[in-house]
């Protein structure tokens, strides 16, 4: 790979470019060992960026944010794709490999509200902006007297809509707010047990072609092992459930010493039923744990989460 120039493909949002730059810095640390002369970032507009007024499930699902970038990777217009793992479908695209993950950012969910109120203090019938069924049902579990309304757009756009009184509060991921330096807006931070994050939340994934041996070896050096183990467990739950954008499922794993803890919840399609599991296993059985818990959830739910 002597004197090779590496092109990283990324969405063009402010947050996506922060993540891409973080990936670039990690790659540059190993560039000399692999004969890489230059690493540049290419901005790519995805369909998910273009369609801002509908749920992802209505316009193509999770792949809306990754598909366009993956096509450029397959066509060799870029060498590495940078994704927010939570936006990626559970099944790998043929010809590609996603096996490198940067150290996880804070996976928790946060509330930003008018007058800096906590969720418990919001007035009845307050309007909560959220982009996912999972968050909607999780909020309803805590406060069933609140109304959830779709909100799309980047973080700045969502905060602006809140300030324009279109919503009384919005739910976002801590990682995005923190990376953008907007922590001063946070009204409340939820623990991962109060609101279980989606699988892979807070994780940046690096993807390459599955036949690019030199880049595969480089990305092994960049990969964060404990993050890798945790998200494999979480993503296996999704794979077993064959989850899509309408699947309201939360999965969060954390490692404590030689043990991995996995907490999952699944809601029926209308959000009226909740199925919950928590279990631990030795770290070397993390992937198996995800599969087993996914199977148990599926059985408990009797497929009530599917259309």
Listing of model-derived features with the role each one plays in the protein:
Residues 85-88, 175-177:
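Short glycine-rich anion-binding loops that position phosphate/pyrophosphate groups of nucleotides
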Residues 78-82, 168-169:
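Short, Asp-centered acidic motifs that coordinate Mg2+ and/or phosphate
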Residues 53-79:
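Short, structured active-site "lid" loops
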Residues 7-9, 42, 81, 99, ...:
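Short, well-ordered beta-strand segments
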Residues 2-51, 58, 66, 141-307:
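Small-molecule-sensing regulatory modules
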Residues 85-86, 94-146:
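A conserved helix-loop-strand patch within extracytoplasmic ligand-binding domains
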